[in-house]
Curated annotation (Swiss-Prot):
Every FBD domain range: 370-417
Name listed for the protein in its UniProt record: F-box/FBD/LRR-repeat protein At3g51530
Keyword set includes Cell inner membrane: no
Mapped LRR repeat ranges: 80-106, 155-182, 183-208, 227-257, 277-302, 325-351
Pfam families attached to this UniProt entry: F-box, FBD, LRR_At5g56370
């Protein structure tokens, strides 16, 4: 709902109750001031903090009303010194017994002491969500005070581009959500002690950045953790050896851009429901695919030449599989997954759009092996989708034909393609030929509906 709609929607409330002391025929233009304070605070909480504070000049009633707003958000302006002083003054003037959330985004170099001041004030107001975003800041990383990891009312903490040092366990018993983005850690113990201090942590987002820190072994030990998103796009650090994940309550796992470590080990995630694994390669010792055997839904963007897939692992719970088809020999990973997933119901393959030719180098320049057909297609397979299918290699045609021919319970097969430019009509002719070939495949499923569509 737009802000103007909030104000207009509130007007009838003022016309419903009580007698007015104003003379007949007098119409107040300041109807909103007559609303109950609780409703006014709800309205103010939906507005930018800068605008909320400016309402103090409206009238005597509004003078202190903004000080009770429970959600504050500040973003730095060009004059960083005025900004820092204004934020400090605003927080010191704030009177709400509980501060629901405080968001701070600073893009210019400033005195890092302010971070401690702001956070301390917020935590004494029993803040429940604290966000410090320095992602646009180009100065040296600001240290987040260790003493501030000791507030039990905090439920959500999001830090971006800071330096942390946690030499011993602290206390954040209420923390449920933790985001650590481009954070520098002083030694292995900082991360380990931080996670150990959050016994009720449920959601963790961890994105490492391009920097040097002293972490050698990154251990995530969180018994209550339910969702984990881990990204390490600059993982080729000389100091780092790898990751260990200990999260027995984990329901969702996302791993992206992890490469070149000595190890990546996941322990005992027997409650896992869904996982999304992308761009993982060149790890000496890892058990990523082997640890996902309890998952019901998987999305994989991997090359079987660069990751371990143990042949003895069975995915007995897997019903939905999504695979990207632009990595080297992706079809052999598909064979492994089909042979290992007896209850699979939905198979979705996703290729890169043909106009992104610079992303198609794997198909053109790698000496790829031939496709080894699976032993069978899962009996439960009902839906087969192939998005942006290009059929640039014979093996891809074999995959499509094999599934259509051998999926006994298949109900719908959909092949979608992206549009082709007029100057590439030869490719259009090849696509039409492939469509005719697939349309002529004799399928074992009598009820399968074959669909061809453009994106």
């Amino acid at each position: 709902m737009k802000n103007s709609e909030r104000f207009s929607a509130a007007k009838p409330l003022m016309e419903q109750g009580g007698k007015s002391s104003r003379k007949p025929g007098f119409m107040s233009e300041d109807r909103i001031s007559e609303l109950p304070e609780v409703l006014l605070l709800q309205i103010l909480s939906s507005l930018p903090t800068k605008l909320v504070i400016s309402t103090s000049v409206l009238s005597k009633r509004w003078l202190s009303l903004w000080k009770m707003v429970q959600r504050l958000e500040f973003e730095s302006s060009r004059n960083i010194y005025d900004f820092a002083e204004n934020v400090t003054r605003s927080l010191l003037s704030h009177k709400a017994p509980v501060l629901e959330s405080l968001h701070l985004k600073v893009g210019d170099q400033f005195d890092g002491v302010y971070v401690g001041v702001w956070a301390t004030i917020a935590f004494t107001r029993h803040v429940r969500e604290f966000v410090l975003d320095l992602s646009s800041y180009h100065g040296p990383r600001v240290r987040f005070p260790t003493s501030l990891f000791c507030f039990d009312t905090l439920e959500t903490l999001k830090l971006d581009y800071v330096y942390i040092y946690v030499p011993c366990p602290v206390s954040m018993k209420s923390l449920r959500t933790l985001h650590l983005l481009s954070v520098v850690y002083k030694g292995d113990e900082s991360g380990h002690n931080l996670f150990a201090s959050c016994p009720n942590l449920e959601h963790l987002v961890l994105r490492r950045g391009f920097f040097f820190d002293a972490v050698v072994n990154f251990i995530i030990d969180a018994p209550s953790l339910k969702t984990l998103l881990l990204s390490d796009p600059f993982s080729a650090r000389e100091s780092s050896r790898g990751y260990v994940i200990k999260a027995p309550s984990l329901k969702y796992l996302g791993i992206e851009s992890v490469e070149g470590f000595e190890y990546f080990l996941i322990e005992n995630v027997t409650e896992l429901v869904e996982a999304n694994i992308r761009n993982v390669s060149k790890i000496v010792n890892e058990n990523i695919l082997g640890s996902l055997k309890s998952a019901k839904r998987l999305s994989l963007d991997l090359s079987p030449l660069k990751i371990t897939y143990p042949t003895e692992v069975m995915y007995h719970q897997l019903v939905y599989l999504e695979m990207h088809t632009h990595k080297v020999e992706w079809w052999n990973l598909l064979t492994h997954m089909l042979d290992s997933s007896p209850k699979l119901q939905v198979l979705k393959l996703i290729d890169r759009e043909t106009r992104h030719e610079n992303l198609e180098f794997d198909k053109k320049y790698k000496d790829q092996g031939k496709w080894n057909q699976p032993k069978y297609v899962p009996e439960c397979l009902e839906t087969f989708m192939w998005r942006n299918c290009n059929w640039g290699r014979e093996e891809e045609k074999e995959v499509a034909t094999y599934i259509l021919r051998n999926a006994r319970q298949l109900k719908k097969a959909t092949f979608s393609t992206d549009p082709i430019e007029a100057k590439r009509l030869c490719k259009l002719a090849k696509r039409r030929k492939m469509r005719e070939e697939l349309d002529g495949v004799v399928m074992t499923s009598n009820s399968c509906h074959l669909v061809f569509e453009f994106e």
